[in-house]
């Protein structure tokens, strides 16, 4: 990651924020998340990257500020959107809201969200009662019925896909 960052890949800072946080360095985690996502959130209000970073790694007050910012953006009739919003909601411990945001913002790049959703960090989201409906609305059920489900996903007795 450091090599990627030194070669100019700015969002490597976001990935480095996870490591800093795991090492207990909250201040560095906040700075790296903010630096690594700022360019990905350029259509959000100024300072959004820092507010969201503080919410992810900071205290309850910082988390509530970040959630309020995201709520304000998503409440707009045509949100100034970024794929970082669903990922941020997942990181803020709001998986149900993250799923909802993905469905509300279908035309944005949510690849970062989906990478995290299918990792161990997406376990809470995959366990939600609304997850099967999310899969249906995303068109995944139709594809999985045709081509087979991914590893760790199976149909339950009700016919819904359940993913570990």
Go through each PLM region and give its residues.
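Alpha-helical protein-protein interaction modules
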Residues: 1-164
């Amino acid at each position: 990651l450091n090599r990627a960052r030194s070669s100019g890949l700015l969002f490597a800072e976001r990935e480095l924020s996870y490591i800093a946080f795991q090492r207990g360095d909250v201040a560095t985690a906040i700075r790296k998340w903010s630096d690594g996502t700022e360019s990905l959130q350029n259509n959000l209000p100024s300072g959004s990257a820092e507010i969201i970073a503080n919410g992810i790694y900071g205290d309850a007050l910082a988390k509530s500020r970040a959630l309020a910012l995201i709520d304000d953006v998503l409440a707009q009739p045509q949100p100034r959107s970024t794929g970082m919003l669903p990922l941020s909601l997942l990181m803020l411990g709001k998986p149900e809201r993250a799923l909802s945001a993905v469905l509300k913002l279908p035309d944005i790049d949510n690849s970062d969200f989906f990478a995290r959703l299918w990792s161990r960090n997406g376990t809470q989201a995959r366990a939600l009662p609304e997850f099967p409906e999310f899969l249906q609305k995303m068109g995944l059920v139709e594809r999985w019925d045709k081509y087979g489900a991914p590893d760790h996903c199976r149909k339950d007795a009700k016919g819904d896909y359940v993913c570990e």
